[in-house]
């Protein structure tokens, strides 16, 4: 055989004899392996065979098998010489590569572009050659697949055999089960038969007792007869002895008598008389035989008496058992009767309460109707007052125009008009009002001229003070001037809210006002021109206490310097057109909202708003929609959204908080924080975080949000929180804000719904949870609020709660839930879900140290009312008879003993426990059909089927989403039997005890 390294061209270099010697040496193998019908098409194209030769090889009747046809083909090719050998080898290369390698020692490497010179090369030939190669590869692949399928078939056959064996075992078990059922039924019938026999034996026993009494009476009569017979026998013996003695005596005395025959006859007669007196021997034998029979019957009666006594003892024992059962049945009957009576009393009490509630409901309906009527009347009055305010505002604008015209006249004319007491309109003054130190010390005050007093008193009648005070008015009727002045004076001393001197209200000296005294210290004002405002900030020149001078520029100077009390909240009313273009804010819910920059020349700048001023509340009622919001504990995003809506006349309640502003700036410069926001949320959906910088979040994960305006709007910056230490981890990034997250939640729910409609699979024990369905009640305040829907706002509602960061909208799905941490020191109670699995596990856990069932307590009606009023009732216990409740005292007593209380309550009781500052550990055991079969024995003890367990598990899984806390879930593939599940539950309880407890923070 040639070497493997030789090329195909070496075959053409060989001579004819060498080639045919190679093939003849392997002729036997070639003839057995090749199929002539596959080789002849190629040989015909190579022109070494003609059509007649092909028909002769394939259809000659002399060639009866394939070996003969292959041999004849070789003989024909041998006549063709070298070309026949080369063409045959090339055909073997395509159709029998292993034979080609055996003959030539070369690998069958097919080069489609290099055929031998025996046939014309064309694209069709190359294509056919390629097709042959691909078909050979497919054939090899199919052979491999066939082998794999054969092995798979063998494995399946083995599995089938095992399954058949298992089925036979199951059939055997079923047969045994049916046999045991039949045996149990037979035993049951046997027990019934034995009971019947026992009853019949008791009847026989009573009959035997009667027979015993009869036999005893008969025995006594026989004994009496025997006694009489004995007495008669003794009497006869005595008579016979006496007769013998008399006979002997008579014989001795009559021995000498001669007449012995006569004596003998006499004795015989006497003997016959005696025999007549005594019994005959036959009668005696009869009496002895009857006596023996009586003794035998007596022995039988004694034995029967003993057996009847034993039966009597057994019957007495059974009678005592039946008596005890009767006593227990009577006791249960009494308990049931008492429970029925208590239930009847409870139903009567509930019916009475329902009647009272119906009465209260009717009263509430009537009160609601009256309140609605009052509200509608108040709204009508408010609308009329608002129209009056608009009319007065127009009058104020006209008066301001007149003041500017009068101000343009020379000062001499102004003084002359002042002497003649004519009204002198001046340019709009800025009223500066501040709290003074020791205001009572300045007792003297000079009055301005009567001309200015008359002017300012006329202006006060139509001044915009009514517009400003209308914000404070609690009554729909407009207040009088004196009440307004009195209210202004009382604001300084009593209320924490004080009006600033920056209100745009032209006022004169309070001494000219009706009802005001010249020395009233509460009305220290300083009328300044707009041009003199910068000088006011640098210095305040006091005037003499005797009089109040008016400078040439028309500035009414203050009597003495004053200082502002920084802790007071000041209300500023001004024209806030596009308020966020006038000011920029920083801060958040942790630090408060501060003014950071003020646009020079804006209305906010004219109102002396400066960086570092904290905004407490915004009141925007000048136009629709109306709102009033507290900004002390709101996030930066919400504050920006609120202030962006302000576009017109508004009121800002502000206070100076320099220390807080400086600390915030230091944290921002040191990059300790990016804003003043800080709160914790629970994420109710899974987010992948595909973009760069986004945080990948799982459902039910707790995050610490530190910035709600991170890199602009639309996203928050959050840190993942350590479950054990509550510290921020290194994993941080951006998450969508509330509105975007809500859209993602809706889209995710829609996708899941479409997938469920296509392939319905049970969710229990499936992959990781993607969505937690949490909805909020629109009647309550949202737990977190980000922005406001203009179409949904109520004008009369006060917006802004310390925990309200979320948006109001028509959608009630909650993507984020505001949570707060707790660290309980004592062992927490344990609540297992589903409840059926919890009951099975509680029986095992209560046997271990550190676990104990929390039993329901029996409470009387008075105790129940007292405990319920204190809020110490958790849930009614599942005990027959009622009035058994799971109480706070029972749970806390176990917690004080350093023991985990095993609770058997519903999931809605978790909210009740949280109100008691008790935070249970909720363990959810995922159950599917396979796992339910492993709990079959425990379910049978509870009287529950597998289908009922699966249905209850599906219902309670839905209730888990509404629970106000996190829970630990155990996958069904994490345990194989009840002991494995018990160890998993213990490990989960120990792990949850170490973690921080996160509960939902309800709105205040």
Swiss-Prot record:
GO terms for cellular component: aggresome; cytoplasm; cytosol; plasma membrane. The modification Phosphoserine is found at residue 544. Disulfide bonds: none annotated. Changing residue 151 to W: In PSORS2; uncertain significance; decreases NF-kappaB transcription factor activity. Keywords: Apoptosis, Coiled coil, Cytoplasm, Disease variant, Phosphoprotein. Gene3D superfamilies: 2.30.42.10, Death Domain, Fas, P-loop containing nucleotide triphosphate hydrolases, SH3 Domains. Residues 807-990 form the Guanylate kinase-like domain. Residues 409-568 are annotated as: Maintains the protein in an inactive state. GO terms for biological process: activation of NF-kappaB-inducing kinase activity; apoptotic process; negative regulation of apoptotic process; positive regulation of canonical NF-kappaB signal transduction; positive regulation of NF-kappaB transcription factor activity; positive regulation of protein phosphorylation; regulation of immune response; tumor necrosis factor-mediated signaling pathway. Residues 128-409 form a coiled coil. Changing residue 209 to P: In PSORS2; uncertain significance; no effect on NF-kappaB transcription factor activity. Changing residue 142 to G: In PSORS2; increases NF-kappaB transcription factor activity. Residues 568-658 form the PDZ domain. CDD domains: CARD_CARD14_CARMA2, PDZ_CARD11_CARD14-like. A linker region between the coiled-coil and PDZ region holds the protein in an inactive state. Interacts (via CARD domain) with BCL10 (via CARD domain). Forms a complex with MALT1 and BCL10; resulting in the formation of a CBM (CARD14-BLC10-MALT1) complex. Interacts with TRAF2, TRAF3 and TRAF6. This is Caspase recruitment domain-containing protein 14. It comes from Homo sapiens (Human). The gene is CARD14.
